[in-house]
Design a protein with these regions (language model features):
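Conserved catalytic motifs of ABC-family nucleotide-binding domains
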Residues: 178, 437
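ABC ATPase NBD coupling module
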Residues: 22, 69, 82-99, 125, ...
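Conserved ABC ATPase "signature" region
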Residues: 133-152, 393-411, 520
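Conserved ABC ATPase signature
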Residues: 156-161, 165, 416-420, 424
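Helix-to-loop junction immediately C-terminal to a conserved catalytic motif
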Residues: 61, 65, 327
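Conserved ABC transporter NBD signature motif
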Residues: 69-81, 335-346
Length: 545
């Protein structure tokens, strides 16, 4: 076997933490990790948030984010320990031998510069190519990555292309200097499932065609299985398991890896609807103030007590806009909302306190949905005071009951949001919504920002609470795995219209319309060769058309 391109030996990384009420102190966040990466191979780094994936990826460039420092070990790239290199050599390494693709291309590109100027910058600055040759290489990469109009797309500004196209432009930026290693840090996590598969296919083919080695960082085992040769499973800064993709997927040895492989094993039987729906959306057409174009077109859906209606579609399909109309934040241009046997005011200001109490919402980003200066007890207690006038011992008793229901317990009552994990924060938001004793809760992408295992726990909790409280859920998501796990009925939205609507079994069974078929076929499956099958099938379909 040839000499590894990269050798990591006993890597240790520390960070400074600032606990509330305590003095800042240093902790170790990566504990003696070792691995090899051969030229032209892809190593997938998998694990939940805080596992150390991105931290290890950045260490391959001798870099650490603010407050993070490499405290021990060796990182060898092309035969030299870069942790012992001089700063000028590290500068040549970054953007030359090793490049980086971040999760958010939109945050990485300069909005004031054209795409081409940014894609070729490192290649020219590193002396790899002249400006003319770098531009020619960039156009070749644009074509390889399946970007439209590859000869001219570089003349656009970042805001003039879609999110998926911009992510592929960032991949072109990373490949332009002809690096030996590319670090892909969650490059498809922020994308819709249909866009994700396009970017994943482009990355897979670009890696194969250029022969570059890669670290592919993600929390989605089904995704990493499609692009990697080997997988390293990380947890709390420790390596849990390391081996070929086939072994990790089909015969995992460690309990944590087995849990990752079996995630989303929830089974939810579709329930028969009750005679009267709790929510009826009738002929809703809406547009945003100051615009001339409708963003919702004649939308009709029903939601029954104790059931879950999943509203699914890509970004811009109208899912969250529908939620804004239902909650009164966006008055519709046409149509009406019937809720619990009455017609709701189209404007939030015209709704009664009872309307507000019975219709609650849980948001995607729990971080920004809670006051960081309030304790968990205060956050959950506010609806109890506002809607029911609870005080003192009565309120405290109910808060503890709600904390028990969300499986946190009384010990969390005096904690602040900063002291909670992502999953714990979302559980607190669920408890706050339940405190109002609603008939219906809108869940807007409530698991999309969470790791698979944490998200799995949240979904199981919601289903259990639904049985207890008989609350209806309008569940907005772009994740088809989530839809299969929890829904009774499904509305597939596309460009502001309901494309397909009905019971879960009906919607997820053929024959499909083209868009629903595209959505379903784009959900990564946890088996080897799935991506190659999708690529081959779509090329055949494209040739046939």
């Amino acid at each position: 076997m040839s000499e590894p391109l990269m050798k990591v030996r006993n890597l240790k990384i520390g960070a400074t933490v600032y606990p509330p009420g305590e003095k800042p102190h240093d902790i170790e966040i990566v504990h003696g990790v070792s691995f090899d990466l051969q030229p032209g191979k892809v190593l997938g780094l998998i694990g939940e948030s805080g596992a150390g994936k991105s931290t290890i990826g950045l260490a391959s460039m001798a870099y650490g984010r603010g407050g993070v420092k490499i405290t021990g070990g060796e990182v060898w790239v092309n035969g030299r320990d870069i942790l012992q290199s001089k700063l000028r050599d590290i500068r040549r390494l970054r953007g030359g031998e090793v490049t980086y693709v971040s999760q958010s291309a939109a945050a990485s590109f300069n909005p004031a510069k054209k795409i081409m100027e940014q894609v070729i910058e490192a290649a020219v600055e590193q002396g790899k190519f002249s400006k003319k040759d770098a531009e020619a290489r960039a156009r070749v990469l644009f074509a390889k990555l399946g970007l439209p109009d590859p000869d001219n797309i570089g003349e656009r500004y970042p805001h003039q292309v879609s999110g998926g196209q911009l992510q592929r432009c960032m991949t072109a930026l990373a490949l332009c200097p002809e690096p030996d290693l590319v670090v892909f840090d969650e490059p498809t996590t922020a994308l819709d499932v249909t866009t994700q598969i396009e970017v994943l296919m482009a990355i897979k083919e670009a890696i194969r065609d250029t022969g570059v080695a890669a670290l592919y960082i993600t929390h989605d085992l089904a995704v990493v299985a499609q692009v990697s040769d080997d997988i390293m499973v990380l947890r709390h800064g420790n390596m849990v398991e390391y081996g070929p993709v086939d072994q990790i997927i089909n015969a995992p040895q460690e309990e944590y890896t087995q849990a990752l492989v079996s995630v989303r094993s929830i089974t939810h039987e579709e329930k028969a609807p009750t005679p009267e729906p709790v929510l009826s959306v009738r002929n809703i057409t809406a547009r945003y103030k100051g615009t001339k174009f409708d963003v919702l077109h004649n939308v009709n859906v029903d939601l029954h007590p104790g059931q879950t209606l999943a509203v699914v579609g890509e970004s811009g399909s109208g899912k969250s806009t529908l939620a804004r109309v239902i909650t009164g934040l966006l008055p519709p241009r046409e149509g009406e909302i019937e809720f619990a046997g009455r017609t709701l005011s189209s404007d939030l200001a015209g709704r009664t306190r009872e309307d507000l109490r019975e219709l609650q919402m849980i948001y995607q980003m729990a971080d920004v949905a809670m006051n960081p200066r309030q304790t968990v007890g205060t956050i959950i207690g506010r609806p109890l005071e506002f809607y029911f006038g609870m005080k003192g011992a009565e309120k405290r008793k109910r808060i503890i009951e709600l904390l028990d229901e969300i499986e946190l317990g009384e010990s969390f009552m005096d904690r602040y949001p900063a002291e909670l994990s992502g999953g714990q924060k979302q559980r607190v938001c669920i408890a706050r919504a339940l405190a109002a004793k609603p008939k219906m809760i809108i869940c807007d992408e409530v698991t999309s920002a969470l790791d698979p295992l944490v998200a799995d726990g949240i979904l199981k909790l919601l289903l259990e609470l639904q049985k207890i409280e008989n609350v209806a859920f309008l569940f907005i998501t772009h994740d088809l795995a989530t839809v299969r796990a929890i829904s009774d009925n499904i509305a597939v939205m596309y460009q502001g219209r309901v494309q397909r609507y009905g019971g879960k079994t009906e919607v997820l069974s053929p024959p499909f319309d083209d868009y629903t078929d595209l959505l379903l076929s784009s959900v990564p499956e946890m088996r080897l060769g799935w991506l190659e099958e999708v690529i081959a099938n779509r090329k055949m379909e494209s040739a046939g058309n």
